[in-house]
C-alpha cells in the first residue's frame, strides 16, 4: 500500500485559497441540472464525489462543459425532473452527496434507474430516506440488503404528507427538500427525532433560494413545500470554499502558527463548519474574521468538553488538535460519525491510540487525553479523506507520522499534502 511520511514541522504560516465546498458543489450541480436556463458554476470542487455527480448527470442527458482544471462548469438545465433515456445504472462511488439527493430527484416522473456504488456505499444506511420517499408515492426496491444501496427506482413520487427521521443524516432531509418543489402535489415534511447537522439544511435552503425556490421552515420540525414549481438558473454562481477543508489549516495555525489565513470562506459563509474557528478560539487560539477569510494565530491550547453535533465533519479535526491541548478533551453528540465514509468514531479512537493518546470511545462521544510525547505510527485511513487530513497534524510535533493510502484525500482535496508542505517550515 502507498504511504506518505510527514517529517516534523516547526511552523506553519501563510494563506490558502480553499477548493470549493463539496456540499455546495454537488447541490449546485443538481439544482442547475433541474433548473430552467444555463448556469455557470465557478470554484467548483474537482474531486471524486463531484465527478460521480457529473458522470450521473451526463448519463441522464444533461449537457455541460468543464474548464481544463475542472473548476468551472457551464451546465444547461433540463427545466424540470431528470429523465433517463431508458433503463439505466448509475455508479456513485462512495459519494453520499450524490447518492442521497439523486435517489430522491430520480423518483420524480417514470424512470427505471439503479443506483449503486463502492462496497462502503452499500454499508451506508438509506432506509430512512426510502421510507419517506415511499410515503410520497415513490416505487423503490432494495436490490441487496434491506435499508442499504443498491436501489432500483421506478418513479412515482408525487408529494403529500411525509415524515423523515432526522437522527442519522441531514442528507435525507436535504434530498426531500430539493425534490419536493418539482412534485405535482404540495409536500409537508415533518422531522422526527433530533435533526443532526442542522447547518447543512441551511446550505440546502440557501441554494434552493438562489435557484428561485423558497419554502416555509417551521423551526426545522416541519417544512411546507409548494408543488409544481420550477428552479431557475441564477446565471453565474460562485461555489464558496470548503469550510471542512479549512479546518486542517486553521488547526495547524493554532498548533504551530505563525498565522494561517484561509480565503474563500468567512463570516458571510453559509456553511456551518465555519463555527470550527470558534472552537479553536475556545481552546486558546486567536481568530480573526473577514467577509471572505478566516485567520488563526497560535495560542496556548487547552482541552474542551463540547457538543459537536453542529459541525460533525470539522469536529474530527478537533480530535487530533486535542493531542496538542492541555488536559482531556471530550467531543459529544457525534453518533453520525459512525455512518460516514467509514465508522469514524471507531477509526479515530483506534488511530489516536497508535500515536499514544489515551482514548475512551463511547456510543456517541470520544474522550482524548494526549500523551507526554507522540509516537511515530502508520495511520490507517479507512479510505476516508478526513482521516488522512486529520492525522497529518501529528507532524506538528517533534515526531513524524506515516499516512497510509494518502491519495484518499482526492474525495475533497486532491492536493492537500502539497498545500500543507507549501506552508510548512520543517523542524
Swiss-Prot record:
Top EC class for this record: transferase
Keywords recorded for this protein, A-Z: Amino-acid biosynthesis, Aromatic amino acid biosynthesis, Cytoplasm, Transferase
Residues that bind 3-phosphoshikimate: 22-23, 27, 169-171, 197, 313, 336, 340
Intracellular or extracellular location(s): Cytoplasm
Main location: cytoplasm
Molecular function in Gene Ontology: 3-phosphoshikimate 1-carboxyvinyltransferase activity
GO BP annotations listed: amino acid biosynthetic process; aromatic amino acid family biosynthetic process; chorismate biosynthetic process
S-S bonds: none
The keyword Transferase belongs to this UniProt entry's keyword annotation: yes
Assembly mode: Monomer.
Name the record gives this protein: 3-phosphoshikimate 1-carboxyvinyltransferase
Protein's organism: Salmonella dublin (strain CT_02021853)
Gene: aroA
Amino acid at each position: 500500500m502507498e504511504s506518505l511520511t510527514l517529517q516534523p514541522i516547526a511552523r506553519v504560516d501563510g494563506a490558502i485559497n480553499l477548493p470549493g465546498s463539496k456540499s455546495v458543489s454537488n447541490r449546485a450541480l443538481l439544482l442547475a441540472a433541474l433548473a430552467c436556463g444555463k448556469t455557470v458554476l465557478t470554484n467548483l470542487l474537482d474531486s471524486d464525489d463531484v465527478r460521480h455527480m457529473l458522470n450521473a448527470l451526463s448519463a441522464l442527458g444533461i449537457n455541460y462543459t468543464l474548464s481544463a482544471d475542472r473548476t468551472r462548469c457551464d451546465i444547461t438545465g433540463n427545466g424540470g425532473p431528470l429523465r433517463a433515456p431508458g433503463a439505466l445504472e448509475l455508479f456513485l462511488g462512495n459519494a453520499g452527496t450524490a447518492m442521497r439527493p439523486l435517489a430522491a430527484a430520480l423518483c420524480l416522473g417514470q424512470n427505471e434507474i439503479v443506483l449503486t456504488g463502492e462496497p462502503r456505499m452499500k454499508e451506508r444506511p438509506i432506509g430512512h430516506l426510502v421510507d419517506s420517499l415511499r410515503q410520497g408515492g415513490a416505487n423503490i426496491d432494495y436490490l441487496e440488503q434491506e435499508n442499504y444501496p443498491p436501489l432500483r427506482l421506478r418513479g412515482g413520487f408525487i408529494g403529500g404528507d411525509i415524515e423523515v427521521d432526522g437522527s442519522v443524516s441531514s442528507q435525507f432531509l436535504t434530498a426531500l427538500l430539493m425534490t419536493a418543489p418539482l412534485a405535482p402535489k404540495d409536500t409537508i415534511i415533518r422531522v422526527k427525532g433530533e435533526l443532526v447537522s442542522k447547518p447543512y439544511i441551511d446550505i440546502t435552503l440557501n441554494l434552493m433560494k438562489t435557484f428561485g425556490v423558497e419554502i416555509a421552515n417551521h423551526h426545522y420540525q416541519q417544512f411546507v413545500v409548494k408543488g409544481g414549481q420550477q428552479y431557475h438558473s441564477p446565471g453565474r454562481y460562485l461555489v464558496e470554499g470548503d469550510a471542512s477543508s479549512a479546518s486542517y489549516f486553521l488547526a495547524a495555525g493554532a498548533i504551530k502558527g505563525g498565522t494561517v489565513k484561509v480565503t474563500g470562506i468567512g463570516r458571510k459563509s453559509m456553511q456551518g463548519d465555519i463555527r470550527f474557528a470558534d472552537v479553536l478560539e475556545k481552546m486558546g487560539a486567536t481568530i480573526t474574521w473577514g467577509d471572505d477569510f478566516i485567520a488563526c494565530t497560535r495560542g496556548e491550547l487547552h482541552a474542551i468538553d463540547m457538543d459537536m453535533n453542529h459541525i460533525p465533519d470539522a469536529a474530527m479535526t478537533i480530535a487530533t488538535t486535542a493531542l496538542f491541548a492541555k488536559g482531556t478533551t471530550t467531543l459529544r453528540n457525534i453518533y453520525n460519525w459512525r455512518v460516514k465514509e467509514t465508522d469514524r468514531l471507531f477509526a479515530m479512537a483506534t488511530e489516536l491510540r497508535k500515536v499514544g493518546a489515551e482514548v475512551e470511545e463511547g456510543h456517541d462521544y470520544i474522550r482524548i487525553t494526549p500523551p507526554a510525547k507522540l509516537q511515530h505510527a502508520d495511520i490507517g485511513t479507512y479510505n476516508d479523506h478526513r482521516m488522512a487530513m486529520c492525522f497529518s497534524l501529528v507532524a506538528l510535533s517533534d515526531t513524524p507520522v506515516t499516512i497510509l493510502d494518502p491519495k484518499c484525500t482526492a474525495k475533497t482535496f486532491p492536493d492537500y499534502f502539497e498545500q500543507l508542505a507549501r506552508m510548512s517550515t520543517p523542524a
